[in-house]
Every structure is written in structure tokens, then in C-alpha cells.
């Protein structure tokens, strides 16, 4: 399935599980009372989950190499150019906003049959391709993309996710026979 000693692989898997617990608790309360968690409780849980993921990210991931130079993890590159920007502590704020925002964005699009799944399929498909390329030093040097050590392992996990989403879409398209719920939509958005 995947290399569980790979820190990139574990980061995505652990973040998926943490956000799945957040979504499951909301679905469980919704099942028992008819209403889900309040917005404050839901955002508090997701904020704590996001901070846990960012802490795990800081502790376990290395930087990347780009055109024979090594950069720290707070640097970002503009694709297909030679520009590298070090965001410093603002990088973690950006990570926080992206994780929390995408988790809730996918949750909002889950209201219509097949909408969340269809849009996630294209996004995760593109990310799968990028992780494969970013994990290969030859491709990255040719395309002026950063080489990220051990990130190619995510291709396996994301491919599994793509396959399961394709199977889910068959039963979630109009008229939907099954629904994703918060336990599915929130962790998928956080994974993106």
C-alpha cells in the first residue's frame, strides 16, 4: 500500500484521519440530535486538527532541492520558473488558511449529487501527477520544478484515493444512492 516510514506519506495519512474524526463527530451529533455541531465547536475542532497537522509538518519534513540548491521548508517556488520565495513564519499561516479553507470548501460543495466528488477528482488527479513529477529528480530538473525527497510515495496514496472516489462517484451521481457526509468531505478537503 505505501511506505509507513515515509514522513510525507504519514503526514497525509494522519491528517486525513484527524479530520475524519472531526467529520465523524459532527455526523454522529447530527444523527442523534438532527442538528450537527455548532459552527464554533466545529471550527474549534478543525482549528486544533489543523494546528496538529502543521506541528507534525514542522517536525517531520525536510526542505527541497531546486537546481542543485537546498531550500528550507518555508520556501515556495513559482512553477516553471527559477523564482524561490522564503515566506518565513508566514508560510505556516498560509498552510493554516489553505488546510482549513479547503476542508470547509469541499464540505460546502458536498450538498449536490456528485459535485464535491467530481471537483475533488480533478484536483487530486493533478496533485497525483505533481507528486510523481516532484519525486523524480530528472523530471524536476527538466521542468524547473523543485525536487522533494520521498514525495513520490504520495502518488500511491493519492492513486488509491482517486480509485475510491471514482467508485464512490458511480453511486453518488444524480440520483445519489449514498452520501459522503462530513466524515468524507472534510478530510478530503484537508488532504488537498
Question: What function would you assign to each model-found segment?
Answer:
Residues 1-24, 53, 58-76, 90-95, ...:
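Alpha-helical transmembrane segments
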Residues 30-39, 76-84:
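Membrane interface segments of multi-pass transport proteins and intramembrane proteases
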Residues 85-89:
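Residue-level signature of the cytosolic catalytic core of signaling kinases
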Residues 39-48, 113-119:
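Alpha-helical transmembrane segments and their helix-start/interface "positive-inside/aromatic belt" motifs
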